[in-house]
Amino acid sequence: MKSRKRQNNMQNETREPAVLSSQETSISRISPQDPEAKFYVGVDVGTGSARACVIDQSGNMLSLAEKPIKREQLISNFITQSSREIWNAVCYCVRTVVEESGVDPERVRGIGFDATCSLVVVSATNFEEIAVGPDFTNNDQNIILWMDHRAMKETEEINSSGDKCLKYVGGQMSVEMEIPKIKWLKNNLEAGIFQDCKFFDLPDYLTFKATGKENRSFCSAVCKQGFLPVGVEGSDIGWSKEFLNSIGLSELTKNDFERLGGSLREKKNFLTAGECISPLDKKAACQLGLTEHCVVSSGIIDAYAGWVGTVAAKPESAVKGLAETENYKKDFNGAIGRLAAVAGTSTCHILLSKNPIFVHGVWGPYRDVLARGFWAAEGGQSCTGVLLDHLITTHPAFTELSHMANLAGVSKFEYLNKILETLVEKRKVRSVISLAKHLFFYGDYHGNRSPIADPNMRACIIGQSMDNSIEDLAVMYLSACEFISQQTRQIIEVMLKSGHEINAIFMSGGQCRNSLLMRLLADCTGLPIVIPRYVDAAVVFGSALLGAAASEDFDYTREKRTLKGQKSSQTKTERFNDSYSSIQKLSMEDRNSTNGFVSPHNLQLSTPSAPAKINNYSLPICTQQPLDKTSEESSKDASLTVGQESLGEGRYNGTSFLWKVMQELTGNARIVNPNEKTHPDRILLDTKYQIFLDMIETQRKYRRMVDKVEGSFSR
């Protein structure tokens, strides 16, 4: 299942990032004209659009751009996209934000990419696009979108293998993962064409386009492709030859798994979040409006970028359980206990742990996907934002709501919240929550992902009347918000019982603007809700942080090469602290010194004529060409290695640039604290939670009863 989906509906979300006031953030803005300033770019490719942003070295977002991307659905369950269109949209967004921000492209030191977990298919011979069907004549449609469900039969066959790698994806692969999609292609493509296919997860394809190098991310390979890092279940090379052979994909094992990106025999080939691949190659730098001075971070799935962009936020007041973790300044122990809820059409719940923790109905644990040596768990709700949309737009009073909200100049959700407040007085009830005390709503319209992992679950309502007024719509909306919150509690309770630590929920997405939903989430879970400054742009902001971390990673790796072989009394950690200090205080003298290795920050541009200008800043000249007419040129530099030597090899020493960057740049956040346990609303919600659980068991019981009877007729 997809990590996070773009929501472009009724919430009246603006294109610009939502930020706290300068007084709340207490972060100084860096001038784009500052010759010593450093800037970073983030790129986020969602289901319906590509986005990019520019941030400064204090984490201020200077510019944000978005461009829609198409998806094609010729028949049911077949949903495809174009990698060429996506790359062109990425280039447009990056060039736009650099121009609009006024930042000198020379000062952009790093770029990070996130995207949906969609399967990109290209030729292993020339990296041209290969059609993925159902129209096999249209090579432009070479991406099977994450939400494509064509591979149902193949998924069942894969799950029947019982392979040990399935243990790390909740016991079974989802039809939305990539191995089932690859198996479908084998069954439906001409044999010769399938033999020429090379496969990328979309985030890894974007970093390939940016660098010409085939480095893959642990995030994509581990979370969506059955890859096991070294030591997990005895894995020594990542991919399992036994697994691929058993499911009929032995072709993928040839040449050291080359068509999947290679194995861990090339230790430098798989990187974790924030680790540097290489500088931009010349072609990509021209297309993006950047320079070859800019380094590229390993890619990441979009929901995980939301985790990066939120969990290091500094709450405006103390949060119990988080104070202790503030002492961890050098590694990801400081992130433990911080649950990221990345919300949009659906919601993903991502949590880090030091040890592997298995939770029924929760994907993972995934090692090394966010930080080396740490494990990530991923729970999720398939219907949150889309659930609210569905209930509101299908109600008879929707037209009236739209008209009244427009007249009032507020979002539909804000208008409904005002109606609920009015109803408290009108009906003389204790609180807004009491308005739905006898309405029991269960909202899994499309099945349940977490924590019961039952695709057959469906929605049900107890207590509905024939009232079709706007007041009834408001109460139905309240019950849907309550359902989302109660299900979040259910997911959290299962994770806690399994051994996870959760002290706060770090929210992102447009749902953060819904004050009623935030209050219900806090009171149902009993946890503080932390809302960072970029609620609508947390994901693309997270990718920009990856770019910042990659820049620091590159500098440190370069310095480490210089120090190699020299005697030193310093420990690794001391050298790290001396070299890092803080992002704002890096020595420009050290940064500009090549020390026998050419830094991308110090490259001399060789151009055939005078440099182009954007806002009076120089850009490298490249031959005029469409942004992505062909992929052939990129393939010339394609390699399973980074270059002279691996930038990823041996870099991990118990420290983390990414966590330091997240702490320095994420900024402040506001908090919605839960009411006391003795508060009447908390007591009422506790009672309704028991009813919520009973509705789940009752629905499943009723299905079993009916299925038993139906089954007896066929005997």
UniProtKB/Swiss-Prot annotation:
Keywords, comma-separated and alphabetical: Kinase, Transferase
InterPro entries per record: ATPase_NBD, FGGY_C, FGGY_N, FGGY_RbtK-like
EC number(s) recorded for this UniProt protein: 2.7.1.47
Gene3D superfamilies: 1.20.58.2240, 3.30.420.40
Annotated stretches, region: Disordered: 1-27
Catalytic activity: D-ribulose + ATP = D-ribulose 5-phosphate + ADP + H(+)
GO molecular function, one term: D-ribulokinase activity
Gene Ontology biological-process entries: pentose metabolic process
Domain of life: Eukaryota
Metabolic or biological pathway, per its Swiss-Prot or TrEMBL entry: Carbohydrate metabolism; pentose and glucuronate interconversion
GO cellular component terms, semicolon-separated: cytoplasm
Protein role: Postulated to function in a metabolite repair mechanism by preventing toxic accumulation of free D-ribulose formed by non-specific phosphatase activities. Alternatively, may play a role in regulating D-ribulose 5-phosphate recycling in the pentose phosphate pathway.
The family this protein is said to belong to: Belongs to the FGGY kinase family.
Name this polypeptide is given: D-ribulokinase YDR109C
Species of the source: Saccharomyces cerevisiae (strain ATCC 204508 / S288c)
